[in-house]
Amino acid sequence: MRLFLWNAVLTLFVTSLIGALIPEPEVKIEVLQKPFICHRKTKGGDLMLVHYEGYLEKDGSLFHSTHKHNNGQPIWFTLGILEALKGWDQGLKGMCVGEKRKLIIPPALGYGKEGKGKIPPESTLIFNIDLLEIRNGPRSHESFQEMDLNDDWKLSKDEVKAYLKKEFEKHGAVVNESHHDALVEDIFDKEDEDKDGFISAREFTYKHDEL
């Protein structure tokens, strides 16, 4: 019995030691351009309007560009909720409008073992990202009262979806129903702690503070 316990403890120790020796994957960030004045820096839950170019590190080939492949239009996305790549959520925090960053994203924070489209499995990716605008996102504390249309101190899926549509339309972005539905479901999956179909003010604020 003692031998069994000793082996179990030893196995746990070795496993923990190996885990500690293996570094967590990180995004390499290079600031290419920065404004002289920065009134606001990005944080989790913010809506970001960006232009970007994505390249494969192995051969430098371009796999996507908003300038070329998106009718020349920048894109909106919400930071910190895995709406984009994990590498974006990690590498675009604390960014200012007018700032341009180069991100080198390892496979674990990109498309991993599966790859996607023109991107082979286990690809390291390079992105040049230009931040054009920051807005309060659907998960920001400041937006709660604006989203709570009936003032009942809780948010329904319809209220969150209506807010998203209004924000996207305000800035000339194309309203994509399936995109909004998926984003709302993701928000409720993370925010609706008691799974009652609503996000209370307490749930909203508590989750936002963790971002």
Curated annotation (Swiss-Prot):
A motif (Prevents secretion from ER) lies at residues 208-211. Ca(2+) 2 binds at residues 192, 194, 196, 198, 203. InterPro entries: EF-hand-dom_pair, EF_Hand_1_Ca_BS, EF_hand_dom, PPIase_dom_sf, PPIase_FKBP, PPIase_FKBP_dom. It holds the Pfam family FKBP_C. It comes from the Eukaryota. The keyword Calcium applies. Inhibited by tacrolimus/FK506. Glycans are attached at residue 176. The keyword Disulfide bond applies. Keywords: Calcium, Deafness, Disulfide bond, Ehlers-Danlos syndrome, Endoplasmic reticulum, Glycoprotein, Isomerase, Metal-binding, Repeat, Rotamase, Signal. This is Peptidyl-prolyl cis-trans isomerase FKBP14. It comes from Homo sapiens. The gene is FKBP14.
